Amino acid sequence: MDLFKRKVKEWVYSLSTDDHYAEYNPDETPTFNMGKRLNSNNGQVNPSQMHLNSVDEEMSMGFQNGVPSNEDINIDEFTSTESNDGVSETLLAWRHIDFWTSEHNPDLNATLSDPCTQNDITHAEEDLEVSFPNPVKASFKIHDGQEDLESMTGTSGLFYGFQLMTLDQVVAMTQAWRNVAKNLNKRSQQGLSHVTSTGSSSSMERLNGNKFKLPNIPDQKSIPPNAVQPVYAHPAWIPLITDNAGNHIGVDLAPGPNGKYAQIITFGRDFDTKFVIAENWGEFLLSFANDLEAGNWYLVDDNDDYFSGDGELVFRDKKSNGPIQDYFEVLKRRTWIKYQENLRSQQQKSQPDTSLQEQKYVPASQKKVAAEQPSTLNAESIKGEDSGSADVQSVQDHESVKIVKTEPSEAETTTVNTESLGQAEHEIKADNVDIKQESERKEDEKQPKVEEKEHVENEHVTESAKKDDDVNKQTEEMNKKEENEIRSDDAKVEEAREEFENIAL
């Protein structure tokens, strides 16, 4: 009799409740979300709820009647201990998605299920022993996935052919992937224990060869690196979208070292490299809605049958007007481009300033010594300018290089004290004395050379003078000789003239 009564109550419960996942529980008091919120506040609506409702009214402008509404969903429904990042994006995205599907593909819009109740979500969380992120809860309270895809011809998954999973399917698929992860972990532990006992890895290779009927499982990676745990399956990966071929888009509740809690990832049979495609569920939904609004879509209708539906929604980039693309490939390419841009920006920020690197730290005391040193050297060089200035300058250059080489390192300069300063000044004075002595020595060496040069020049002048005197004497003698000859000739002429006159008389 009790069993019959229970069955009757379950039947009545199924007719009177909106629960999709939650089963009838005679010990549970029925609760309603709005009534619970109003009772908790003595029948008064929370101010934040009023603000969100006013925002919803602004966002609903331009929407036609009959489009599913989520005005009764607000952030206050979610626990304050969890992050509400992505909740507002989820609400906004679903408004655009509902409006677009009702306008361009009513058959696709008809596949969207009614909302889940809080009881559904609570029971699912209890069965999976997890707490769904708030954007996921908000999404389930708008649409519980897609249904009746097989019965409705000409329709496909909402996300360019990929199906939005119902809460029942999410729980069932999560359990299936948990079994996969459990078996992988079990076989791995068995292989490690066997290798430890036998000291050989041949058994481990045989075990790996039988996993999932594959020769081996490749190394698991992620983009960005270390954002997702490097495993094939994980119990904390909750699938939300499926391609019905073993691949999923889901929420990651156990991210890697460089990941973020509740990030959205791709995983499954074809994803040895996992891709982080969004930081949260709301961000992913909003990016999909933006693609629809931007015109990155195409409806494939293979026949002219009126009853075949509006066609299958596929991705095609509007700007390039290129071919139809697989949505997984689009998400992977976008993630890779975003990762490369972030990598370049990080490299630019981490590049050191070369001008700062070339500057070497010099303490104040060392700078003072360096400032005083050139004046001392210049004074010495001026003093010996007329005697070996080039040699003195080379010595100064040598000493300046010596001073630079003996500069303390950054670690040593922190311990410079007055004693080291006095020692440095003493060494500099000693170097100045050496420079002065070197200059005097070179001046002394140069002085004999100057005297010798003057002596040689004097001898050369004396010899030249002697030669000039000899030439002058010779010239005078020749002149005198010529004068004597001329006088002798004149006398002979005079004598001949007188003889001629005597003869004439």
Curated annotation (Swiss-Prot):
In terms of InterPro entries, this protein maps to: Knr4/Smi1, Knr4/Smi1-like_dom, Knr4/Smi1-like_sf, KNR4/SMI1_regulator
Q: What stretch or stretches form a coiled coil here?
A: none
Question: GO MF terms on file?
Answer: DNA binding
Q: Any idea which residues bear Phosphoserine here?
A: S202, S203, S381, S394, S400
Instruction: Give the region (Disordered) as residue ranges.
Output: 343-505
Biased composition, class Basic and acidic residues, residue ranges:
396-408, 424-495
Q: Which compartment or compartments is the protein found in?
A: Nucleus
Compositionally biased, Polar residues: which spans? 343-358, 411-421
**GO terms under cellular component:** cellular bud neck; incipient cellular bud site; mating projection tip; nucleus
What is the predominant subcellular site recorded for this chain? nucleus
Q: What does this protein do?
A: Protein involved in the regulation of cell wall assembly and 1,3-beta-glucan synthesis, possibly through the transcriptional regulation of cell wall glucan and chitin synthesis.
Subunit structure of this chain's protein: Interacts with TYS1.
Homology family? Belongs to the KNR4/SMI1 family.
Other facts = Present with 5680 molecules/cell in log phase SD medium.
Q: What is this protein called?
A: Cell wall assembly regulator SMI1
Which species is this record about? Saccharomyces cerevisiae (strain ATCC 204508 / S288c) (Baker's yeast)
